Regions:
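Conserved signature/switch motifs of ABC ATPase nucleotide-binding domains
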Residues: 94, 146, 167, 199
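Helix-to-loop junction immediately C-terminal to a conserved catalytic motif
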Residues: 64
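Conserved ABC ATPase signature
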Residues: 147-151, 155
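Catalytic Walker B motif of ABC-type/P-loop ATPase nucleotide-binding domains
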Residues: 172-175
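ABC ATPase NBD coupling module
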Residues: 27-30, 81-98, 198
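Conserved ABC transporter NBD signature motif
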Residues: 72-80
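Short coil-to-helix segment of the ABC ATPase nucleotide-binding domain corresponding to the Q-loop/switch region
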Residues: 110-118
């Protein structure tokens, strides 16, 4: 019988190893990521900062399985995200990853509640009670039946966050999550991000906002596609 090492370190919620990403435009080649490696533990919040064009959005897309790195590997909760079919990446993302975009990715013909439930259906673990609790905690329970076009900017942001959190993801990725929000909505979003880390999710924030970066346990700076600190 194989023995188990009780002292073995747990698998990081996110493990990205030696990521490279090239983009081609005619004869020109741009190296967007240069050997980026990043490990984020469960319950840890990491802020990724850097100037425009430094590779932050490309890195987030690769971590989410929305883009495929040309080199290196991404694992989420021990499951490979890279070198998989598009369908397999979508399956891993649905079950283990929440992505909060600066512009909420909502389906217009569905209500707010139906958008959140649809996210759960992708992961095949519908929990309507959790949906209602989540909408209540985000202060939009009274807008559950509204369509995205009927929401204010702050309500749209919170609905997008509800979709990202629908499946209690092991990894939450947020791209400028407070970028265009009023102070009250931004505070509510930050509160929820902290709560997810307290729950045990690994949280990665891509931001230019120093105040948002300050809530992170660790700050990683990208420059020309490489980590500089």
């Amino acid at each position: 019988m194989m023995s188990v090492d009780a002292t073995a370190s747990p698998v990081p919620a996110l493990l990205a190893t030696d990521l490279y990403r090239f983009y081609h435009a005619g004869d020109d080649e741009t190296l967007a990521l240069r050997g980026v490696s990043l490990a984020v533990e469960a319950g840890e919040t990491v802020a990724v900062i850097g100037p425009s064009g430094s590779g932050k959005s490309t890195l987030l897309a690769c971590l989410a399985g929305l883009d495929e790195p040309d080199g290196g590997m991404v694992h989420v909760a021990g499951v490979p995200m890279s070198r998989q079919s598009e369908a397999e990446r979508a399956r891993v993302r649905a079950r283990n990853v929440g992505v909060l975009f600066q512009s909420a990715n909502l389906v217009e013909h569905l209500s707010v509640r139906a958008n959140v439930i649809a996210s759960q259906q992708l992961a095949r673990k519908v929990d309507r009670a959790r949906v209602d609790t989540l909408l209540d905690r985000l202060g939009i329970a009274d807008r559950a039946g509204a369509r995205p076009s009927e929401l204010s900017g702050g309500e749209t942001a919170r609905a997008g966050l509800a979709v990202a959190l629908a499946n209690e993801p092991a990894l939450l990725l947020a791209d400028e999550p407070t970028g265009e929000l009023d102070s009250a909505t931004a505070a509510r979003v930050v509160e929820r991000l902290k709560a997810e880390a307290d729950r045990g999710a690994a949280v990665v924030l891509v931001t230019h906002n120093a105040e948002l970066a300050a809530i992170a346990d660790r700050v990683v700076e990208l420059h020309d596609g490489a980590i500089v600190q």
